[in-house]
């Protein structure tokens, strides 16, 4: 699996991280850069997570009661507020949570996130709202180093009250930071953290600190960490992630076994970055994965099919003839810099 990951990343800059959800063991940590393999690409280079982050947003919003699985938001190619325009691809409208996540509707996640931050009935201040939001994200292993047993780890960014008040001089609200609702702006994560996010969803609310050494006796890596997310929030999100692979933005995986996943397309100067998080099988998951390819385009273009191949290799022990041909095609693609 490690060799396959390295082969898929040939000629590209990015990382593939896979973790066993049952015990936190790192199964694969393949990386590539213009100067060769560098583990910091997976654990020490936080970047915007893009729409993969919508899974964590949905779990938080459900847990706080800001939304229900039936909450619908209308979207016509995006949303405009004053001189701010955020685009979205064409899809039917309005959408409830399951389809909003499967189709990766930007409008849905921007508007629901803003409604949480601006809710002065549920929260006395916007500082309280953003602090509450941040605490959920931190409980899922985001926003700080996880203290894995590999040197070079960095924690990433999760906008908090102090940071926002300092950056925007106390003049901010939900729409000032609403890009965080779709994993852009004031939020960054490493591929390791994104893989661990997939672990927490696969396990419906808990994880072990990821570690590379399987024979560790250190209690740091043997103690379950529980998220703040309400237990009943996981089912609709997992169903939506399964729908994303079956009929949504991650359908390019095309597997015969049930994978749950979420693509991410990260806006970037030049060509977008391609990302994917997921786990398989849907029941009793054996592997969680995150793939991040710089300048790889849409999440469905590279990250999702790469993840599907690595998952197949792990669960089946080998690739089918068709999958091997796909792996060769991906390996032959060279993407070092933005083609724009």
Q: How does the language model describe each region?
A:
Residues 14-50, 59-299, 332-340:
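Beta-lactam-recognizing serine transpeptidase/beta-lactamase-like catalytic domain environment
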Residues 1-20:
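Beta-lactamase-like hydrolase cores
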Residues 194, 299-311:
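Short, charged, low-complexity patches
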Residues 221-222, 306-340:
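Short, gly/Ser/Thr-rich active-site loops of penicillin-recognizing serine hydrolases
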């Amino acid at each position: 699996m490690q060799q396959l990951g390295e082969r898929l990343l040939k000629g590209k800059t990015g990382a593939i991280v896979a973790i066993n959800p049952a015990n936190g063991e790192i199964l694969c940590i393949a990386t590539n850069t213009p100067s060769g393999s560098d583990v910091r690409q997976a654990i020490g280079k936080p970047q915007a997570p893009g729409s993969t982050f919508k899974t964590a947003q949905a779990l938080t919003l459900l847990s706080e009661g800001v939304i229900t699985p039936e909450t619908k938001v209308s979207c016509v190619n995006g949303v405009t507020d004053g001189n701010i325009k955020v685009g979205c691809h064409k899809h039917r409208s309005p959408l409830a949570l399951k389809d909003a996540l499967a189709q990766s509707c930007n409008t849905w996640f921007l508007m629901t996130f803003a409604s949480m931050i601006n809710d002065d009935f549920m929260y006395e201040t916007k500082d309280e709202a953003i602090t509450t939001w941040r605490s959920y994200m931190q409980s899922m292993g985001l926003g700080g180093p996880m203290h894995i047993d590999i040197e070079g780890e960095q924690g990433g960014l999760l906008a908090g009250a102090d940071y926002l008040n300092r950056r925007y001089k106390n003049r901010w609200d939900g729409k000032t930071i609403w890009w965080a609702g779709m994993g852009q702006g004031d939020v960054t994560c490493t591929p390791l953290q994104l893989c661990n996010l997939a672990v927490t969803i696969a396990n419906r609310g808990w994880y072990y600190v990821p570690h590379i050494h399987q024979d560790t006796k250190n209690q740091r890596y043997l103690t379950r960490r529980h998220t703040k997310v309400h237990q009943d929030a996981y089912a609709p999100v997992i169903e939506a992630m399964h729908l994303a692979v079956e009929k949504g933005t991650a359908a390019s995986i095309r597997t015969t076994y049930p994978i749950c996943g979420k693509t991410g397309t990260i806006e970037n100067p030049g060509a977008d970055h391609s990302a994917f998080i997921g786990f398989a099988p849907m029941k009793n998951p054996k592997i969680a994965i995150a793939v991040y390819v710089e300048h790889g385009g849409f999440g469905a273009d590279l990250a999702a099919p790469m993840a599907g191949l690595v998952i197949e290799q792990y669960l089946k022990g080998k690739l089918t003839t068709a999958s091997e041909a796909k792996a060769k095609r991906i390996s032959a693609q060279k993407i070092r810099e933005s083609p724009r």
